Amino acid sequence: MSGDDTLARLAAVIESRRGGDPEASYVARLFHKGTDAILKKVGEEATEFVMAAKDGDRPKIVAEAADLWFHAMVALAHFGLTPAQVLAELERREGQSGLEEFALRKVRGREAESTKESGP
């Protein structure tokens, strides 16, 4: 069983909770509370991951990474996005130097800014 399958199954479960009862489902409760609550939880989990990594506690790093991924997937679903889209982006970047990719993003950002400034 591949990681892609695990992510796809988890994404399907998360999506199935979207209209669920907030009293019966943690994910439904997050969806019900909205964007700010979801993003706050992602931030909390990111901080916990960093703290575990700083401590070098390998089992806790894995556990916190799982929490972070899970909550990031809830955020993706909230915005109508899927893990497959993130995986496609990672595949697009595969084999590309991180420095080259960063430089290209900076160029694209400047182009987008100049387009906004010249506007209609």
UniProtKB/Swiss-Prot annotation:
Record GO terms (molecular function): ATP binding; phosphoribosyl-ATP diphosphatase activity
GO biological process annotation, one example: L-histidine biosynthetic process
Keywords of this entry: Amino-acid biosynthesis, ATP-binding, Cytoplasm, Histidine biosynthesis, Hydrolase, Nucleotide-binding
Domain of life according to the entry: Bacteria
Subcellular location, principal: cytoplasm
Top-level EC class as recorded in UniProt: hydrolase
Listed name of the protein: Phosphoribosyl-ATP pyrophosphatase
